[in-house]
């Protein structure tokens, strides 16, 4: 690990009330003393106690170019576990950049992306799952997603995995003693005891894996295709969900010829909406290309909102769309419920998770759709304060552990002997150690921290 003192802007770029430049490393106080002069000449930066603040001026040589506050943190009681000084200057890129340049001229090195959190991990201040949660919390733009990240940052996932590891470790100790030291008269484990422990662990891992997709939706959002025949109300729906006139709406069929994109927040879920061209047979080459893109977006989407005209009978295009949505996370929206209904929803009901009568011009339908989307994607069943998996790395490790425990259960039921059970339990423990970062290679650590921005 590099033990140099590093400096970087820790706040988002652009104009703002303040900007923070963070120093971390053994020379943080010495560097700060060169670039920050307390307003009270009796105060010395080098002698500042942890968890204290001083007001003063930021210096480049003999020139004071700004005034602000320095916050001091003594090792190991800091984010990184090192001496840390946070220098708060006026916001805007010019002043903050000049302050960083002054710190570098005074002996600090520029921080790499994620280097502060990487040092926190290497110094034992955070586990790997907690470090990953830092990035999730920074990226969160919904309350539930932020709560999930905060729970992991506070150790919810590490504690949950730790409990399953403890159960398997105790089981493995007994298995090892019985297999390796038969002369010691170690009592054999009863199959019922083995099955009970393994089943409990497998159930906990199954729950984590089952909830992964809903957690990912809350953290990352989901791509949502709005599809249907021309003039069914797709663009009106886009405008309703967006809260403003994002797409052009006219009585002319085929107004939308290309995909119109808009990110919206529906309840606590971020939807990346794709309003698509109306699905119909056409001789127009441009419209045909738009329709091809519509089908492509439908196939790629994590959520489908299929819009049907409730004031007209089902058509061949409607039936083709319903068949294409079968088995997918799709909701049928029978639009124009304010008009006499000619649409037989029962014919398509089996192809959709749910069928909802709506009026895409009314705000009440927005609330109905939001509740249905949350129910379909499972986000309303998530406890935001519970342990949850984040990212493919964690999911893959948890899945390997679950499959190994399932293999141990198969070994018990198949009568393959305790040696076979022990091998499977070992594999499960290795996978759980990979998840928590105890077995993490340098490549894995690099992959985790390359997602971070400079300054965190």
Name each model feature, range by range.
Residues 273, 307, 333:
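Generic enzyme active-site microenvironment
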Residues 287-311:
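Inter-motif core of Ras-like GTPase G domains
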Residues 242, 277-278, 302, 309, ...:
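Short glycine-/small-residue-rich Rossmann-like dinucleotide-binding loops
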Residues 55-65, 70-74, 254-282, 300:
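Switch I (G2) and immediately adjacent beta-strands of P-loop GTPase domains
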Residues 2-9, 13, 143-265, 282-284, ...:
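C-terminal-of-GTPase-core extension/linker across diverse P-loop GTPases
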Residues 1-147, 151, 155, 331:
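A glycine-rich (often HGG/GG-containing) alpha/beta subdomain
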Residues 271, 303, 331:
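Short, Asp-centered acidic motifs that coordinate Mg2+ and/or phosphate
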């Amino acid at each position: 690990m590099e033990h140099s003192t590093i400096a970087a802007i820790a706040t988002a770029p652009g104009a703002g009330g303040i900007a923070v430049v963070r120093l971390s490393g053994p020379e943080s106080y010495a560097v700060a003393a060169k670039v920050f002069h307390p307003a009270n000449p009796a105060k010395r930066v080098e002698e500042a106690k942890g968890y204290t603040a001083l007001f003063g001026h930021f210096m480049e040589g003999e020139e004071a170019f700004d005034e602000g506050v320095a916050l001091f943190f003594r090792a190991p009681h800091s984010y990184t576990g090192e001496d840390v000084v946070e220098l708060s200057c006026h916001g805007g890129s010019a002043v903050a950049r000049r302050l960083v340049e002054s710190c570098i001229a005074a002996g600090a090195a520029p921080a790499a992306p994620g280097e502060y959190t990487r040092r926190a991990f290497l110094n034992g201040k955070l586990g790997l799952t907690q470090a990953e949660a830092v990035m999730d919390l920074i990226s969160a733009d919904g309350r539930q997603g932020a709560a999930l990240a905060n729970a992991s940052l506070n150790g919810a996932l590490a504690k949950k995995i730790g409990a399953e590891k403890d159960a398997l470790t105790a089981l493995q100790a007994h298995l090892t003693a019985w297999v390796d030291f038969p002369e010691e008269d170690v009592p054999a484990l009863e199959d019922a005891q083995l099955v009970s422990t393994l089943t409990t662990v497998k159930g906990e891992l199954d729950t984590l894996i089952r909830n992964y997709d809903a957690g990912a939706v809350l953290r990352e959002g989901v791509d949502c295709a709005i599809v249907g025949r021309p003039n069914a109300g797709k663009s009106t729906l886009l405008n309703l969900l967006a809260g403003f006139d994002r797409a052009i709406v006219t009585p002319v069929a085929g107004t939308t010829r290309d995909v119109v994109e808009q990110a919206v927040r529906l309840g606590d879920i971020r939807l990346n909406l794709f309003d698509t061209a109306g699905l119909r047979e056409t001789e127009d080459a441009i419209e045909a290309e738009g329709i091809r893109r519509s089908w492509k977006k439908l196939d790629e989407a994590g959520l489908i909102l299929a819009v049907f005209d409730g004031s007209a009978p089902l058509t061949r295009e409607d039936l083709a769309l319903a068949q294409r949505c079968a088995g997918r996370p799709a909701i049928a929206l029978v639009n124009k419920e304010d008009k006499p209904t000619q649409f037989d929803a029962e014919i398509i009901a089996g192809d959709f998770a749910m069928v909802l009568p709506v009026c895409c011009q009314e705000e009440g339908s927005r609330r109905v759709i939001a509740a249905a989307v949350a129910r379909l994607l499972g986000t309303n069943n998530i406890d935001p304060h519970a342990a949850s998996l984040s990212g493919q790395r964690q999911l893959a490790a948890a899945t390997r552990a679950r499959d190994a425990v399932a293999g141990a259960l198969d070994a018990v039921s198949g009568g393959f002997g305790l040696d076979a059970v022990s091998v499977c339990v070992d594999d499960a423990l290795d996978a759980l150690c990979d998840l928590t970062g105890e077995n993490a290679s340098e490549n894995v650590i690099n992959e985790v921290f390359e997602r971070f921005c400079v300054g965190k």
